[in-house]
Amino acid sequence: MFTHYSLDTLLGHSLTAIGRAADLVWWIFDVDGAEYSLHTQCTFRVLHDGEAVLSRSDIYCIRDDKPLGRDNSWFDYDVAELAPLLPAKVVSIECSEMNDLTICTENGLRIEKEPQ
């Protein structure tokens, strides 16, 4: 059993999925055949090659072209658009004393999490 967890465990391993349950966003990583999940309920954004492609605020933006219900936010749409970029190998992780977190992948994805 683990007595502590380290984000460095994710280095060299792949981000395989992104999803949500209500406003909790989950990031799934494959670490030697085991799934590790990072859960966030704070401000974040995802950039691809420097362009913002996903953010927490997208959860609350409903698409007008879809009926109300499940998977009708811009977040859900944008996650589906990101799917072809996954899996993405993690090449760097930075965490500040203020709990800012940045995860970068080899294909240009950059996840930036900010504390609230």
PLM features: residue spans?
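Surface-exposed, interaction-prone regions used to assemble/regulate multi-protein complexes
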Residues: 1-116
